Amino acid sequence: MKYFAEYIVGRNGPIEVFMQPQNPQLVAEEVSRKLTSPGYLDGARRFAVVVWALPDGTTHMDDVPESSPARATYIQCGGSTKAMSVEIRATHEDGSYEHYAVAREPIADPDAWTTVTWDNGNPEPFSLRLHPEEVFTGEQAAPVFRAYIEAGALPPTELLRRLDV
């Protein structure tokens, strides 16, 4: 069985979360609740959810070294339940990686951009430049997270835009 850990990021920094007992369905349910609850992911107190899978055979996040590529392979969102980005990163043993912005549907106009902003505790809000199709609500993001957690599924390639980060 696959195990998962989360980081919840807010104004006061990241908080690690490791549910026990757990299975992929329970983790997906818990993450869905966080993504869809306006009182939880509000874009200020809490503005990001990161989920990563523990390596096969590992049953607790404390057993995964900080340097493990597993900790740098994840799905994340940033923003609020009303407007968020969804990103996926795949990190390899040699440290190389691919990082993608996820879209709800294929990009209609590659020259069209919008901004998702949240309060990360700095004097100025954090802004992320996205195509309009890359802006999700929590309800729209939940199935993407669920597929990633329950089946290890990535969205189709036409919905992934590689980022240079």
Task: Please give the residue ranges for each predicted region.
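Short secondary-structure capping micro-motifs at structural edges
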Residues: 36, 58-65, 69-76
